[in-house]
Amino acid sequence: MKVVEVKHPLVRHKIGLMREGDISTKRFRELAAEVGSLLTYEATADFETETVTIEGWNGPVDVDQIKGKKVTVVPILRAGLGMMDGVLEHIPSARISVVGIYRDEETLEPVPYFEKLASDMNERIALIVDPMLATGGSMIATIDLLKKRGCTSIKALVLVAAPEGIKALEAAHPDVELYTAAIDRCLNEKGYILPGLGDAGDKIFGTK
């Protein structure tokens, strides 16, 4: 599985700011979108382009345009919504496919409760966004769902990943690409990433 830890200075700086324990909801939300934007830049670097001729201000001009499959952004509810706007800054015409999954706090297993996907998933590149890749359960369940709907080109964008989650994702879906702003140390006994960001969903929405 292709794993890319984006080590650009801006990404490292912004993730560092997000680790502050007393960060405000407003600031955390802004940074989540900003890092999501930077991860999108990296994740789309291999998109193919084609040369087309358009009418410029002084006559015809050849320009590059992205070709191939269209894109759908897949936020995993609820925390994934915090990264979605950052992706749409670069791909404003992308379709949005929503997947609702929460993690059972006792078993740490993913529990799906909602889905609304683009009708032509087999013709699209899916960019899944979720702030945390902890155990990997929610991400794996989401990818399972997308593949059942015919999607064959999938990239996952996360702010922070745990080694345990990366290992689980690779075992389940080695064909998927993972882009993360940081690979952290480990999970604690409750399945939270250390040092991590805390509960990203609570911090993005300001509610528990």
Curated annotation (Swiss-Prot):
Give the record's free-text account of how this protein's activity is regulated: Allosterically activated by GTP.
Cofactor: how and how many bound: Binds 1 Mg(2+) ion per subunit. The magnesium is bound as Mg-PRPP.
**Taxonomic classification, please?**
Bacteria, Pseudomonadati, Pseudomonadota, Gammaproteobacteria, Alteromonadales
**Cofactor entry:** Mg(2+)
Query: For 5-phospho-alpha-D-ribose 1-diphosphate, which residues are the binding ones?
Result: R78, R103, D130, P131, M132, L133, A134, T135, G136, G137, S138, D199
Which is one GO molecular function term here? magnesium ion binding
- Please report the organism this UniProt entry assigns to the protein: Shewanella oneidensis (strain ATCC 700550 / JCM 31522 / CIP 106686 / LMG 19005 / NCIMB 14063 / MR-1)
Q: Which SUPFAM superfamilies match?
A: PRTase-like
GO biological process, alphabetically ordered: UMP salvage; uracil salvage
Q: What does this protein do?
A: Catalyzes the conversion of uracil and 5-phospho-alpha-D-ribose 1-diphosphate (PRPP) to UMP and diphosphate.
Report the family membership: Belongs to the UPRTase family.
Question: What Enzyme Commission number does this protein have?
Answer: 2.4.2.9
Name of the protein in its database record: Uracil phosphoribosyltransferase
Which residues are uracil-binding?
Answer: I193, G198, D199, A200
| Reactions the enzyme catalyzes | UMP + diphosphate = 5-phospho-alpha-D-ribose 1-diphosphate + uracil
Q: In which pathway does it act?
A: Pyrimidine metabolism; UMP biosynthesis via salvage pathway; UMP from uracil: step 1/1
Q: Which InterPro entries match?
A: PRibTrfase_dom, PRTase-like, Upp_B, UPRTase/APRTase, Ura_phspho_trans
Key words, A-Z: Allosteric enzyme, Glycosyltransferase, GTP-binding, Magnesium, Nucleotide-binding, Transferase
Q: Does the keyword section mention Transferase?
A: yes
